[in-house]
Amino acid sequence: MNNSRVEGSSGRAARKLRFALMGPAFIAAIGYIDPGNFATNIQAGASFGYKLLWVVVWANLMAMLIQVLSAKLGIATGKNLAEQIRDHYPRPVVWFYWVQAEIIAMATDLAEFIGAAIGFKLILGVSLLQGAVLTGIATFLILMLQRRGQKPLELVIGGLLLFVAAAYIVELVFSQPNLVQLSKGMAIPSLPTSEAVFLAAGVLGATIMPHVIYLHSSLTQNAHDGTRQERYSATKWDVGIAMTIAGFVNLAMMATAAAAFHFNGHTGVADLDQAYLTLEPLLSHAAATIFGLSLVAAGLSSTVVGTLAGQVVMQGFVRFHIPLWVRRSVTMMPSFIVILMGLDPTRILVMSQVLLSFGIALALVPLLIFTGNKSLMGDLVNTTLVKRIGWMIVVLVVALNLWLLIGTLLGL
């Protein structure tokens, strides 16, 4: 009886520790449902119905593994990915990594910031510039939570992630997808045309985000509760839950677009404004409003995460620190320039996703090298199977993103 009591109390302690260590993956998961994902998933669903849902499933499984490895690096070494690159690579390589990571962080932020501004424009009827001002104010307010520590920020961003998930549950109810076809689309790989291959590459490129690979390793590096194995076990739960929610949102985006647009003859829906305006007469004003609100929530939370990632990149690579409000002020300038110049915001959003393709392999390769290093990782070193899967992901991601890049440059 005493043994069962001890086992029960140790089980409760393990659950308590697991709960206490949850949060970092929810911040990272926001990067997987940013406005770039909205645009890509809507276009894929409108063009090909449920046929590309399997890409979302596999991309999400890859992303889960990548985020576990990133978090594990921070747990095992007490240093984030940028710091490990700084410690192990020659200075010119480190500076190259810093510059490309900053460019990619800004490109990511451009898409996220403009996405939130479009959301405000759609639901409030304001101009895109006014939407951008509202986005700037809102992100400053959210970033102020960082002064109170990481946990309040985790709670707010986790809440926004859950809001977007709830919004898409409602959208699925409104759109009433065919569950049999939906299940087939998730389970059976299909690439019916060259455009489908291009969109599949876009879905993968919009799913695996280099900036959250850097960020996640920094969010776990200073956790000291429990043993390393206990922290790693808790992290796997954290990633599993957060990334499952993010994966559901991506599936729901594509399934809603398929049910609402593709099967109603609107196969050419390709941008966020058009999706909003098409949803209203097809489903209802409420469905369109919920879409707009979810876009705002995803844009705001992901642009905050992008700002945090940029801070980690700068501090990790070059040991230079600037206040978050200064970084936020500087990184939102390109968005205002794009808007003031009257450029097509959705086109800019898609182009920024293409730019991200350069950074994915650059983040993944050192991550796999470091997490496969026994002297660095100790008992948390990657197994042979994980190493093989990791390098297969690198090859696949590089190949598909090269396809995406070439197709974009050639106007395919």
UniProtKB/Swiss-Prot annotation:
Entry membrane topology: Multi-pass membrane protein
Principal cellular location given in the protein's record: membrane
Alphabetical list of InterPro entries matching this protein: NRAMP_fam
Gene Ontology molecular-function annotations: cadmium ion transmembrane transporter activity; manganese ion transmembrane transporter activity; metal ion binding; symporter activity
Job description of the protein: H(+)-stimulated, divalent metal cation uptake system.
Family: Belongs to the NRAMP family.
Pfam families for this protein: Nramp
Keyword terms, alphabetized: Cell inner membrane, Cell membrane, Ion transport, Membrane, Symport, Transmembrane, Transmembrane helix, Transport
Any single biological process term in GO: iron ion transmembrane transport
UniProt subcellular location: Cell inner membrane
Transmembrane segments: 19-39, 46-66, 94-114, 122-142, 155-175, 196-216, 241-261, 290-310, 329-349, 350-370, 389-409
GO cellular component, one term: plasma membrane
Gene that encodes the chain: mntH
Name under which the protein is recorded: Divalent metal cation transporter MntH
UniProt organism field: Enterobacter sp. (strain 638)
